[in-house]
């Protein structure tokens, strides 16, 4: 990543706090679909399985996982939608 997380400008945010698999990834799929190409999405989740599922989602669909961070049971992800 070329710049610090706090300097990233997000285009949308997905709050998946309190949701469990498969809901966070299902919501992520819809939210990414609504983003413009190259848009940056911040995801906030509490389900530990997102640590596995979200990186795989990005690889499988060609999106960039710009950054991820874990803070006291909360998992944060910054995802850049692939260019069309």
UniProtKB/Swiss-Prot annotation:
Active site: 21
GO MF annotations in UniProt: sulfur carrier activity
Function comment: Sulfur carrier protein which probably makes part of a sulfur-relay system.
PROSITE patterns, per the entry: UPF0033
Name of the protein described by the UniProt record: Sulfur carrier protein TusA
Main location: cytoplasm
GO cellular component terms, A-Z: cytoplasm
Organism field: Pseudomonas syringae pv. syringae (strain B728a)
Similarity section: Belongs to the sulfur carrier protein TusA family.
InterPro entries (UniProt xref): Sulphur_carrier_TusA, TusA-like, TusA-like_sf
Location of the protein in the cell: Cytoplasm
One BP annotation, GO: tRNA wobble position uridine thiolation
NCBIfam families listed in its UniProt record: PRK00299.1 (NF001423)
Disulfide bonds: none
Keyword annotations of the record: Cytoplasm
CDD domains linked: SirA (cd03423)
């Amino acid at each position: 990543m070329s710049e610090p997380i706090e300097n990233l400008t997000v285009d949308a945010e997905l709050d998946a706090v309190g949701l469990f698999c498969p809901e966070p990834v299902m919501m992520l799929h819809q939210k990414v679909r609504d983003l413009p190409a190259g848009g940056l999405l911040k995801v906030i989740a509490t389900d530990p399985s997102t640590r596995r599922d979200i990186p795989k989602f990005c690889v499988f669909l060609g999106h960039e996982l710009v950054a991820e961070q874990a803070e006291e049971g909360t998992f944060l992800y910054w995802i850049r939608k692939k260019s069309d």
